[in-house]
Amino acid sequence: MANRAYLEQKQTQCSIINSSFSMTHRDLPTLTLSGKIRVMVTFFLFLVSTAFNASFLMKLQRQTQKKEEVKKLTRMKVLLKHLTLANLLETVIVMPLDGIWNVTVQWYAGEFLCKALSYLKLFSMYAPAFMMVVISLDRFLAITRPLAVKSNTKVGQSLIAVAWFLSIVLAGPQLYIFRMIYVEDISGQTGNFSQCVTHCSFPEWWQEAFYNLLTFSCLFIGPLLIMLVCNAKIIFTLTQVLHQDPHELQLNRSKNNIPRARLRTLKMTVAFATLFTICWTPYYVLGIWYWFDPEMLNRVSDPVNHFFFLFGLLNPCFDPLIYGYFSL
């Protein structure tokens, strides 16, 4: 992240004809020691996340293919299946792309893959964030509107479809704003260094700021606020129920409006929101800092930049552990 951000910061000329700009050789990004460590950790997390999420999907598949009869997954397990698919998508796209790009430093894959992979990267980051929102909304409705949810079995399916649709649409601008650029030496000759960046894609600075703010809001702030509101409302509703009839709840939870299994899924939903917040907050705080103060790259060390990004990659690795802990 730091190398490519630094490269865009150094862009001082814009040529739509040849998509090139001037830079001295010593300004070009290189693979540092901290970058090598980031690559190794990234591929390790790739293996861990792939193994964990694939194992959970296989477990769900076995549950639907019993010898006696084909069993239908519960609504919660369907939601978890889509979250796992989204996590796998993020794992197989974001992690290898980041690892390989940090090794090569520059972009060798051409204009088409520059746009396509930039689109897929953002799409695969939107999907798990939106799926966690869907799970929070589903649990919120299950507690506050249990009869309505039970009578309308398509609520969960509709929320899932909306989440995938928004992921596809909101990542669309990546196909336009990302492009390949080439570095010129001080004599004006185009060199051999190429990169995939958003150079000259926004005519006005406020347009880029607006797009960055929109992306940040949809990837982090929006999902986080929705999850917090849903979980707060759930806890408030549970507190009211416990205060209204605590004796009956203790004697027979299985017949209560909030059975033991539902309480377990609620705890899991809170765990998802907590993990999402812990993993991604450092990364996005660093991103906001860079938007308002690009010179921060000269003050924050490379190891710190790499660490914050790697912290975000822990999210798809730990989600399956949450499934396992709550024994769903």
UniProtKB/Swiss-Prot annotation:
Protein name from the UniProt record: Gonadotropin-releasing hormone receptor
Disulfide bonds: C114-C196
Predominant location: membrane
Glycan-carrying positions: N18, N102, N192
Family that this chain belongs to: Belongs to the G-protein coupled receptor 1 family.
Topological domains, Extracellular: 1-38, 98-115, 185-212, 301-306
One GO BP: cellular response to hormone stimulus
A Gene Ontology cellular-component term: plasma membrane
Position of the signal peptide: none
UniProt xrefs under Pfam families: 7tm_1
Gene Ontology molecular function terms on file: G protein-coupled receptor activity; peptide binding; protein-hormone receptor activity
Membrane-spanning residues: 39-58, 78-97, 116-137, 165-184, 213-232, 282-300, 307-326
Membrane association type: Multi-pass membrane protein
InterPro entries to which the protein is assigned, alphabetical: GPCR_Rhodpsn, GPCR_Rhodpsn_7TM, GphnRH_fam_rcpt
